[in-house]
Swiss-Prot record:
GO (cellular component) term, any one: plasma membrane
Species of the source: Pectobacterium carotovorum subsp. carotovorum
Source taxon at top rank: Bacteria
Gene: fliR
Record-linked InterPro entries: FliR, T3SS_IM_R
Membrane spanning stretches: 13-33, 44-64, 65-85, 98-118, 131-151, 153-173, 177-197, 213-233, 235-255
GO-annotated biological processes: bacterial-type flagellum assembly; protein targeting
Name of the protein this chain belongs to: Flagellar biosynthetic protein FliR
Keyword Membrane: yes
Amino acid sequence: MLTFNSWDMVNWVSQFFWPFVRILALISTAPVFNERAIGNRVKIGLGVLITLLVAPYLPLNTTPIFSVAGVWLLIQQILIGVTLGLSMQLAFAAIRHAGELIGLQMGLAFATFFDPTGGPNMQVVARFLNILAILLFLTFDGHLWMISLLADSFYTLPISANPIISHAFLALARAGGLIFINGLMLALPIITLLLTINLALGMLNRVAPQLSIFVVGFPITLTVGIMTLGLLLPLIPPFAEHLFSEVFDLLADILTQLSSS
Protein backbone atom coordinates (compact mmCIF):
# COMPACT_ATOMS: atom_id res chain seq x y z
CA MET A 1 0.00 0.00 0.00
CA LEU A 2 1.32 3.41 -0.97
CA THR A 3 1.79 5.94 1.80
CA PHE A 4 1.60 9.66 1.16
CA ASN A 5 2.53 12.09 3.93
CA SER A 6 2.98 15.85 4.17
CA TRP A 7 6.72 15.66 3.47
CA ASP A 8 6.09 13.86 0.19
CA MET A 9 3.54 16.54 -0.67
CA VAL A 10 6.08 19.31 -0.02
CA ASN A 11 8.68 17.57 -2.18
CA TRP A 12 6.17 17.08 -4.98
CA VAL A 13 5.12 20.75 -4.92
CA SER A 14 8.75 21.91 -4.82
CA GLN A 15 9.58 19.72 -7.80
CA PHE A 16 7.10 21.69 -9.93
CA PHE A 17 7.14 25.08 -8.19
CA TRP A 18 10.76 26.11 -8.85
CA PRO A 19 10.73 25.34 -12.61
CA PHE A 20 7.36 27.08 -12.87
CA VAL A 21 8.80 30.29 -11.39
CA ARG A 22 11.66 30.39 -13.92
CA ILE A 23 9.36 29.56 -16.83
CA LEU A 24 6.75 32.14 -15.85
CA ALA A 25 9.45 34.81 -15.44
CA LEU A 26 10.59 34.16 -19.00
CA ILE A 27 7.05 34.16 -20.40
CA SER A 28 6.38 37.51 -18.67
CA THR A 29 9.39 39.19 -20.32
CA ALA A 30 10.14 37.31 -23.55
CA PRO A 31 9.00 38.70 -26.91
CA VAL A 32 5.73 37.41 -28.37
CA PHE A 33 4.80 35.70 -25.08
CA ASN A 34 4.62 38.97 -23.12
CA GLU A 35 2.23 40.69 -25.52
CA ARG A 36 -0.69 42.32 -23.75
CA ALA A 37 -3.05 40.77 -26.29
CA ILE A 38 -2.26 37.39 -24.70
CA GLY A 39 -4.24 37.10 -21.47
CA ASN A 40 -2.68 36.29 -18.12
CA ARG A 41 -4.61 33.02 -17.93
CA VAL A 42 -3.11 31.91 -21.23
CA LYS A 43 0.39 32.81 -20.02
CA ILE A 44 -0.08 30.94 -16.75
CA GLY A 45 -1.58 27.96 -18.58
CA LEU A 46 1.36 27.87 -20.98
CA GLY A 47 3.75 28.06 -18.03
CA VAL A 48 1.98 25.17 -16.30
CA LEU A 49 2.05 23.09 -19.51
CA ILE A 50 5.80 23.62 -20.04
CA THR A 51 6.42 22.89 -16.35
CA LEU A 52 4.54 19.59 -16.56
CA LEU A 53 6.67 18.61 -19.54
CA VAL A 54 10.03 19.64 -18.05
CA ALA A 55 9.81 19.15 -14.27
CA PRO A 56 9.49 15.31 -14.14
CA TYR A 57 12.93 14.95 -15.76
CA LEU A 58 14.74 17.33 -13.40
CA PRO A 59 16.69 16.27 -10.30
CA LEU A 60 14.69 16.40 -7.07
CA ASN A 61 15.10 19.67 -5.17
CA THR A 62 14.17 19.47 -1.49
CA THR A 63 14.62 23.16 -0.62
CA PRO A 64 11.63 24.22 1.52
CA ILE A 65 9.54 26.91 -0.11
CA PHE A 66 8.91 28.77 3.16
CA SER A 67 12.50 29.26 4.27
CA VAL A 68 15.40 31.66 3.85
CA ALA A 69 16.95 29.35 1.27
CA GLY A 70 13.58 29.14 -0.46
CA VAL A 71 13.31 32.94 -0.70
CA TRP A 72 16.80 33.15 -2.20
CA LEU A 73 16.01 30.33 -4.63
CA LEU A 74 12.80 32.11 -5.64
CA ILE A 75 14.70 35.34 -6.38
CA GLN A 76 17.34 33.35 -8.25
CA GLN A 77 14.81 31.65 -10.54
CA ILE A 78 13.09 34.97 -11.26
CA LEU A 79 16.43 36.57 -12.15
CA ILE A 80 17.35 33.74 -14.51
CA GLY A 81 13.97 33.79 -16.28
CA VAL A 82 13.92 37.58 -16.59
CA THR A 83 17.51 37.57 -17.89
CA LEU A 84 16.61 35.10 -20.63
CA GLY A 85 13.48 37.02 -21.61
CA LEU A 86 15.04 40.48 -21.63
CA SER A 87 18.05 39.22 -23.59
CA MET A 88 15.74 38.13 -26.39
CA GLN A 89 14.11 41.57 -26.32
CA LEU A 90 17.42 43.06 -27.51
CA ALA A 91 16.75 41.88 -31.07
CA PHE A 92 13.32 43.50 -31.20
CA ALA A 93 14.61 46.67 -29.55
CA ALA A 94 17.27 46.93 -32.28
CA ILE A 95 14.65 46.66 -35.03
CA ARG A 96 12.37 49.19 -33.30
CA HIS A 97 15.35 51.54 -32.93
CA ALA A 98 15.99 51.26 -36.66
CA GLY A 99 12.35 52.11 -37.33
CA GLU A 100 12.55 55.19 -35.12
CA LEU A 101 15.69 56.39 -36.92
CA ILE A 102 14.08 55.85 -40.33
CA GLY A 103 10.87 57.58 -39.28
CA LEU A 104 12.84 60.53 -37.93
CA GLN A 105 14.69 61.00 -41.22
CA MET A 106 11.47 60.61 -43.23
CA GLY A 107 9.76 63.29 -41.19
CA LEU A 108 7.34 60.86 -39.55
CA ALA A 109 8.54 61.38 -36.00
CA PHE A 110 5.20 63.02 -35.21
CA ALA A 111 3.19 60.04 -36.52
CA THR A 112 2.74 57.89 -33.43
CA PHE A 113 0.82 54.62 -33.43
CA PHE A 114 -1.61 54.29 -30.53
CA ASP A 115 -1.66 50.77 -29.12
CA PRO A 116 -5.24 49.92 -28.00
CA THR A 117 -3.96 47.06 -25.84
CA GLY A 118 -2.20 49.50 -23.53
CA GLY A 119 1.33 48.89 -24.78
CA PRO A 120 3.87 51.63 -25.46
CA ASN A 121 3.10 54.02 -28.29
CA MET A 122 5.51 53.77 -31.25
CA GLN A 123 6.22 55.60 -34.43
CA VAL A 124 4.49 54.20 -37.49
CA VAL A 125 7.67 52.86 -39.11
CA ALA A 126 8.90 51.37 -35.82
CA ARG A 127 5.54 49.68 -35.29
CA PHE A 128 5.57 48.27 -38.82
CA LEU A 129 9.08 46.85 -38.44
CA ASN A 130 8.21 45.46 -34.99
CA ILE A 131 5.22 43.55 -36.40
CA LEU A 132 7.42 42.30 -39.24
CA ALA A 133 10.04 41.17 -36.71
CA ILE A 134 7.41 39.24 -34.72
CA LEU A 135 6.22 37.46 -37.87
CA LEU A 136 9.81 36.60 -38.84
CA PHE A 137 10.52 35.40 -35.30
CA LEU A 138 7.59 32.99 -35.51
CA THR A 139 8.53 31.98 -39.06
CA PHE A 140 12.05 31.06 -37.97
CA ASP A 141 10.60 29.05 -35.04
CA GLY A 142 12.25 31.47 -32.65
CA HIS A 143 9.61 30.79 -30.00
CA LEU A 144 10.42 27.06 -30.14
CA TRP A 145 14.16 27.75 -29.93
CA MET A 146 13.52 29.97 -26.94
CA ILE A 147 11.55 27.24 -25.14
CA SER A 148 14.28 24.73 -26.02
CA LEU A 149 16.92 27.05 -24.60
CA LEU A 150 14.82 27.47 -21.46
CA ALA A 151 14.58 23.68 -21.04
CA ASP A 152 18.35 23.34 -21.54
CA SER A 153 18.93 26.02 -18.90
CA PHE A 154 17.68 23.62 -16.21
CA TYR A 155 20.63 21.35 -17.01
CA THR A 156 23.19 24.09 -17.67
CA LEU A 157 22.08 25.99 -14.57
CA PRO A 158 20.31 23.53 -12.23
CA ILE A 159 17.86 24.66 -9.57
CA SER A 160 19.93 25.07 -6.41
CA ALA A 161 20.53 27.64 -3.70
CA ASN A 162 24.16 28.08 -4.72
CA PRO A 163 25.18 31.69 -5.41
CA ILE A 164 25.20 32.80 -9.05
CA ILE A 165 27.20 36.00 -8.57
CA SER A 166 29.07 36.32 -11.83
CA HIS A 167 30.11 38.72 -14.55
CA ALA A 168 27.36 37.25 -16.74
CA PHE A 169 24.96 40.06 -15.84
CA LEU A 170 27.67 42.56 -16.82
CA ALA A 171 27.90 40.79 -20.17
CA LEU A 172 24.14 41.25 -20.54
CA ALA A 173 24.47 44.98 -19.84
CA ARG A 174 27.22 45.28 -22.43
CA ALA A 175 25.07 43.42 -24.91
CA GLY A 176 22.78 46.45 -24.90
CA GLY A 177 25.12 47.80 -27.55
CA LEU A 178 23.47 45.34 -29.94
CA ILE A 179 20.45 47.65 -29.99
CA PHE A 180 22.39 50.61 -31.37
CA ILE A 181 24.81 48.69 -33.62
CA ASN A 182 22.24 46.50 -35.38
CA GLY A 183 19.58 49.21 -35.41
CA LEU A 184 21.97 51.65 -37.08
CA MET A 185 23.12 48.99 -39.56
CA LEU A 186 19.52 48.35 -40.62
CA ALA A 187 18.62 52.04 -40.92
CA LEU A 188 21.93 53.29 -42.37
CA PRO A 189 21.05 52.94 -46.11
CA ILE A 190 17.86 54.98 -45.77
CA ILE A 191 19.50 57.49 -43.41
CA THR A 192 22.35 58.04 -45.89
CA LEU A 193 20.00 58.48 -48.84
CA LEU A 194 17.66 60.87 -47.03
CA LEU A 195 20.58 62.85 -45.65
CA THR A 196 21.90 63.26 -49.21
CA ILE A 197 18.48 64.45 -50.36
CA ASN A 198 18.28 66.95 -47.51
CA LEU A 199 21.72 68.30 -48.42
CA ALA A 200 20.63 68.63 -52.05
CA LEU A 201 17.47 70.45 -51.00
CA GLY A 202 19.56 72.76 -48.82
CA MET A 203 21.81 73.62 -51.77
CA LEU A 204 18.73 74.12 -53.95
CA ASN A 205 17.33 76.52 -51.39
CA ARG A 206 20.55 78.54 -51.56
CA VAL A 207 20.38 78.69 -55.36
CA ALA A 208 16.65 79.47 -55.53
CA PRO A 209 15.59 81.21 -52.28
CA GLN A 210 12.10 81.79 -53.64
CA LEU A 211 11.53 78.02 -53.57
CA SER A 212 9.71 76.98 -50.39
CA ILE A 213 11.89 74.15 -49.12
CA PHE A 214 9.36 73.12 -46.47
CA VAL A 215 6.61 72.62 -49.05
CA VAL A 216 8.79 70.67 -51.49
CA GLY A 217 11.14 68.87 -49.09
CA PHE A 218 8.64 66.92 -47.00
CA PRO A 219 6.84 65.15 -49.89
CA ILE A 220 10.18 64.29 -51.50
CA THR A 221 11.77 62.82 -48.36
CA LEU A 222 8.56 60.96 -47.48
CA THR A 223 8.15 59.48 -50.97
CA VAL A 224 11.81 58.50 -51.32
CA GLY A 225 11.81 57.06 -47.79
CA ILE A 226 8.77 54.86 -48.45
CA MET A 227 10.18 53.66 -51.79
CA THR A 228 13.57 52.89 -50.24
CA LEU A 229 11.92 51.08 -47.33
CA GLY A 230 10.03 48.95 -49.86
CA LEU A 231 13.31 48.08 -51.59
CA LEU A 232 14.85 47.29 -48.21
CA LEU A 233 12.13 44.83 -47.17
CA PRO A 234 13.62 41.76 -48.97
CA LEU A 235 16.85 42.28 -47.01
CA ILE A 236 15.16 42.35 -43.61
CA PRO A 237 14.52 38.55 -43.25
CA PRO A 238 18.22 37.52 -43.55
CA PHE A 239 19.19 40.44 -41.31
CA ALA A 240 16.61 39.40 -38.69
CA GLU A 241 17.72 35.76 -38.90
CA HIS A 242 21.33 36.78 -38.24
CA LEU A 243 20.22 39.06 -35.40
CA PHE A 244 18.13 36.35 -33.72
CA SER A 245 21.00 33.88 -34.07
CA GLU A 246 23.36 36.39 -32.47
CA VAL A 247 21.03 36.89 -29.52
CA PHE A 248 20.57 33.14 -29.01
CA ASP A 249 24.36 32.74 -28.97
CA LEU A 250 24.47 35.52 -26.39
CA LEU A 251 21.91 33.68 -24.24
CA ALA A 252 23.90 30.46 -24.41
CA ASP A 253 27.06 32.36 -23.41
CA ILE A 254 25.28 34.01 -20.46
CA LEU A 255 23.99 30.65 -19.22
CA THR A 256 27.48 29.18 -19.49
CA GLN A 257 28.95 32.05 -17.49
CA LEU A 258 26.24 31.74 -14.86
CA SER A 259 26.81 28.01 -14.51
CA SER A 260 30.56 28.49 -14.06
CA SER A 261 30.16 31.00 -11.21
